[in-house]
């Protein structure tokens, strides 16, 4: 039973955990070797509540920011101070980390679909769709999904 436990979005946690581990090992070198990720203030993350915390990312570097946040949050929560040395922190990743993303973007290819499974709260853009400007009403279900 525990093997098939799901999150509020219907994703199987066992699969999510393994995706985080695999993607983490693949991307660790980017943030640890190729680009040296500068971390400051990881002690703040340890003192945050378990629910209702929202971090905002710059859209232009979105996927890199999301992956970096997964690395930093998991490293910090497993006792590392301002460091992602030794990728062992991914063995038991925090599974209730989510980020807000455009539904259209998260369906655009294999990598976005995998990242969506790992933790996207997908919403519909109200100002743009498929490269065209639009004017949509905000979907209240999108807003309520953020609070799940």
Give residue spans per PLM region:
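Soluble catalytic domains of membrane acyltransferases
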Residues: 33-148
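A transmembrane-helix-recognition feature enriched in membrane-embedded lipid enzymes
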Residues: 1-40, 68, 109-117
């Amino acid at each position: 039973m525990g093997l098939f436990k799901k999150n509020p979005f219907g994703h199987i946690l066992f699969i999510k955990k393994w995706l985080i581990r695999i993607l983490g090992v693949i991307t660790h070198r980017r943030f640890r070797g190729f680009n040296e990720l500068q971390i400051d203030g990881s002690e703040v993350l340890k003192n945050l509540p378990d629910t209702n915390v929202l971090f905002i990312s710059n859209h232009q570097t979105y996927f890199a920011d999301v992956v970096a946040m997964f690395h930093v949050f998991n490293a910090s929560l497993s006792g590392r101070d301002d460091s992602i040395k030794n990728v062992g922190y991914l063995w038991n990743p925090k599974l209730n980390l989510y980020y807000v993303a455009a539904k259209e973007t998260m369906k655009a290819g294999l990598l976005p679909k995998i990242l969506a499974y790992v933790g996207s709260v997908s919403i519909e853009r109200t100002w743009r769709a498929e490269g065209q400007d639009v004017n949509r009403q905000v979907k209240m279900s999108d807003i309520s999904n953020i609070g799940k």
